[in-house]
Amino acid sequence: MLSIRYVLADNAMEEGPLRTLVAQSGDTYLYENAYVLPLGFMMDEDVAEKWDYAGGGDIGTQNQLANLLGSDRLLLTAVESESKAGESSFVAQDSAYYYATYSKTGVDNLQEQVSSGRTRGFTKVSHGYILDLGYCEAGEEVKVTNTANELVQLVVYRLDLMALRTAYEALAAQAVEVTEVSDTRVKGNVDVTQAGRLIFSIADEDGWTLYVDGKKTDSETFGGAFISTYLTEGTHEFELRYKSPGFLTGAVISAAAVMLFAATMAGRRKRKKG
């Protein structure tokens, strides 16, 4: 949901309730996502404080957040699957999007094969992340294989679209309006009807400085990843400025080097004249 409106794929079988094919060029396909949050959005402060993003595991944290945002249904529910050396498989009991987690492995590449003919490859699997198995129709068989013939124990989950919609609508209710974007600046405004946490889908990395209503503002890291700050009710203007870390030091060193070079050349010219 985080500001990713379009995705590229190498096949024409990625459409589903959350993704629509909008363009094609050769073997490259452009899809538009249905639920896309803007660059910034508000979250109730109580939700932000209660969400245990670090202690519930990849799936548990997402289910907890959806619940805090108002859903009375699990966002992701485990389904029956089977794993053996070189292959994991399951049969989709419902038409839905499916995801999978797995135990630590040294395998780097996995290949998904769906009985409908759709395929998908996963790389750098040893880094550990949630596998997006895509949209499957009820009755389709899904296999995830590896050429190393290693046991990769998958746990497969079904996405509940109603829970997703509830969470999305809660976050999209108070969204920012971006008025200016450049390589070093993002400006906009937000109408806050309920005080809470403004969260930007921008990584909280060195180099960013936040201004709210013209004043430099200390930001916080939300979810261990994103820039955020607390806002009161009312209309606020914001600006995020970016300056590459070490830029000033580098500029001083460069200037000093230029001055040293100039002084050296001037000295050489004087010696030649003498």
Please report, for each region that a protein language model flagged, where it lies by residue:
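Conserved luminal/periplasmic juxtamembrane motif of membrane-embedded glycan-processing enzymes
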Residues: 1-86, 106-119, 126-150
